[in-house]
Design a protein with these regions (language model features):
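Active-site regions of metal-assisted phosphoester/phosphodiester hydrolases
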Residues: 1-34, 58-59, 73, 80-81, ...
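Active-site neighborhood of divalent metal-dependent phosphoester/pyrophosphate hydrolases
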Residues: 11, 39-53, 58-66, 184
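Aromatic- and glycine-enriched glycan-recognition loops and surfaces
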Residues: 67-73
Length: 198
């Protein structure tokens, strides 16, 4: 099984269009069973997306509508144009850089049959950049979560508390894979990486 995870930075990434094109070409060639993306943005003030690409599975309790520059929708459409189909879901977590709906997406070759919107941070304030969520999708009998966790030393929204919520939710599933940007350096002992390995 091929799994891939990437923090895309999407709309704020320098040379965004060229990098998106290269990424979609890579996905079309490698065709991982599942890929998970973080910092999947859309401009909050952009017009609503007209035709939603095939395979979209709305995440429960998401009230933010897809906009025409949504990165996940663009990736789905570009894959369609290459004859590659994925089911996909997108969940915004917060306002990023004062102008983006910033969130996560999961793409699956197998049909998505369920999705979960999991609040990981103490705050649920959409305008607070420290708000953290996980997007989980079920494909077959397996759950795949994409996350973008906070930092270990954040006193307001500590990594350890977010990890505890995520591990409890994923642990309740028969089989679950955790993908994402954990904001934890592997060479730093006694912090996030070690906690994940416990």
């Amino acid at each position: 099984m091929k799994l891939l995870t990437l923090n895309t930075h999407s709309l704020i990434e320098p040379d965004y269009e060229a990098k998106r094109e290269a990424f979609v070409d890579f996905i079309a060639e490698e065709q991982p069973e599942v890929f998970a993306l973080q910092e999947v943005n859309q401009t909050a003030a952009a017009p609503l997306l007209g035709d939603v690409p095939e395979g979209y599975y709305p995440c429960p309790d998401n009230t933010v509508q897809l906009k025409e520059d949504n990165h996940a929708a663009a990736v789905a459409r570009m894959l369609e144009e290459r004859g590659v189909h994925y089911d996909w879901s997108w969940l915004p977590a917060k306002v990023g850089y004062d102008k983006y709906d910033e969130g996560m997406a999961v793409f699956s070759r197998a049909p998505i049959t369920d999705a979960e919107n999991l609040l990981l941070s103490k705050t649920s304030d959409y305008s607070n950049w420290k708000t953290r969520r996980a997007l989980g999708v079920c494909a077959g009998d397996v759950w795949y979560y994409t996350v973008h966790l906070g930092w270990w030393k954040d006193e307001e929204e500590p990594f350890a508390a977010q990890w505890e919520k995520l591990s409890q939710a994923a642990g309740a599933k028969q089989t679950a894979f955790l993908l994402g940007d954990f904001n934890s350096e592997a060479d730093v002992r006694g912090e996030g990486y070690d906690l994940i390995l416990c």
